Amino acid sequence: QCTGNGHITRSIDMINELRKYVHVDVLTSGSHSEVKLPFDVKFKQKGLSYFFGKNGSIDVLRTIRDNNPLRFLQEIKEVPTHLYDMVISDFEPVTAWSAKRNWVYSVALSNQAALLDADVPKPNIISPISQLIINNFCPANKHYGLFYQKLNSKLYYPPVRDVIKKLKPTDGSHYVVYLPFYSTEKILKHLQTFENTQWLVFSKHATQSYSNGNVHVEPIDE
């Protein structure tokens, strides 16, 4: 699911590990991820996806404008999931619904799947629309959640890429910020009020590296 970068970065090492044991073909849908997969993608679909806004929420108008339900239904029919023994989906709706349509066993392996688990803490007030999406966006025969606490046997820690594990971190004098739902300008305006603090911002909306006062900005590219 190319709505954001998390789905893509999680998939890289998982796919490489799976390929040690079985044949794996890759399908992506959506087009709002800056991180690129380091291997061939067999199927590239539009799917259904939301778009990041710049004021702390989803860009609703663009999400409505750029999604086409009829195209989505056609993609479900065209993706040949019937040729596969299993479908694994990280909150990717085309393969999930195609597998259901073709009676192919499917596994949901995602952060969103964790939200279906009774042991995962929930907010006191849950939007009915949000709950409807979580429950029905990507149907599956089995759900395994990626969560930051090992609360039961169906929850797993999110995978960390090998390239990240091999880095040698240092204790710098700055704080790291990643807020993809906000514009770079809005983040800068807020952080620059803390004049004696250094900030490193990774931004979905930046196209090059630059510094502005006590804030250094880096684009997302890997």
Each model region followed by its residue ranges:
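Conserved nucleotide-sugar phosphate-binding/catalytic loop shared by glycosyltransferases and other
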Residues: 2, 24-71
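Short amphipathic alpha-helix
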Residues: 7-18
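An aromatic- and histidine-rich active-site surface loop
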Residues: 11, 87-102
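Donor-nucleotide binding loops and adjacent catalytic segments primarily
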Residues: 15-17, 157, 161-164, 168-222
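Short internal beta-strands
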Residues: 24-31, 146, 199-204
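Short loop/helix-cap segments at secondary-structure boundaries that form the rim of catalytic
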Residues: 32-39, 96-101, 137, 147-155, ...
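Conserved nucleotide-sugar donor-binding subdomain of glycosyltransferases
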Residues: 57-86, 93-94
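Active-site-proximal region of nucleotide-activated glycan assembly enzymes
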Residues: 105-156
